[in-house]
Amino acid sequence: MKITVIGAGHVGATAAHRIAEMQLAKEVVLLDIVEGIPQGKALDMYESGPIGLFDSKIYGTNDYQDTADSDIILITAGMARKPGMSREDLLLKNATIVKEVTDRIMQYSSNPIIIMVSNPLDIMTYVSYVRSKLPKERVIGMAGVLDSARFRSFIAEELNVSMKDINAFVLGGHGDSMVPVVKYTNIAGIPLTELLSQEKIDSLVDRTRKGGAEIVNYLKDGSAYYAPAASAVEMIDAIVHDRKRILPCSTLVTGQYGMDNVFIGVPVKIGKNGIEEVLEINLDTAELEALRQSASIVESNCSNLADLLS
């Protein structure tokens, strides 16, 4: 198994190290355009092997030829958000970067599974899908796993219970229009609505939607990376071990939930071939409308990239 991580910034480097520690690949490639950065970080990771007890070979590079025949490619390249910026503010700059990255990786890997982390997430996943010409099952956006983790952590904090007992997921676009689905949220099987007031639930939902911005505002210069990296690697683990995990991910819907030809976060089954099934769950009218509204925002932004992708 060969896994390539594009972008040696905080998210990419953290993900690469986690991939190696979990021994998900015999070969881990960390690529960045800045000379010396991926090489130095990869060497540092490799030297932690005797302590972390892993044998994965990790190396850094600036040459896309070194990514040849990758089984999975994690794209984290792009500008990070700064205080006051929305994910959509990054649209044109990161779309140009993701387009170039996708074109380059596809020169050397014929049938990889691409996992997108770059923001704005759903739109960048669309860009990579269009440019790669891969089957839709093999181009996946990491969004719902992260958003759901944030929602779960806030619930656990509020109730003072173990995170392991929180089951929750977030659908929709990876932005302010995301849709935390409260009615499927439970704590060891107990519905969230039996443990918290609607006012408190609404507060947690709002904090989840603003979870990324909360971290950006603290950091001032940079954005979240530990949780995004862990979320992406959870998806990689599901693929490598063919776990058939049910995870909320950004995928191209083709009629599900009354939406078509748009990348949006929905529950999917993930295994060795990428997305094996899109699950259609029962949503109430308000949830379904919120999901479709979220998708319409993604569609609108994607339409602005027609010239770039032509």
Curated annotation (Swiss-Prot):
Q: Where is the active site?
A: H174
Coiled coil (UniProt feature): none
**Which residues are recorded as binding substrate?**
R81, R87, N119, R150
One example of the protein's molecular function in GO is: L-malate dehydrogenase (NAD+) activity
Sites where the protein binds NAD(+)? G7, A8, G9, H10, V11, G12, D32, N94, V117, S118, N119
* GO BP term, example: tricarboxylic acid cycle
The EC number of this protein is 1.1.1.37
Asked whether the UniProt record includes NAD among its keywords, one would answer yes
Q: What class of enzyme is it?
A: oxidoreductase
Q: Which reaction does it catalyse?
A: (S)-malate + NAD(+) = oxaloacetate + NADH + H(+)
- Keywords for this protein: NAD, Oxidoreductase, Tricarboxylic acid cycle
Q: Does the keyword NAD apply?
A: yes
Q: Provide the family line.
A: Belongs to the LDH/MDH superfamily. MDH type 3 family.
So what does this one do? Catalyzes the reversible oxidation of malate to oxaloacetate.
Q: What is the name attached to this protein's record?
A: Malate dehydrogenase
Organism, scientific name: Prosthecochloris aestuarii (strain DSM 271 / SK 413)
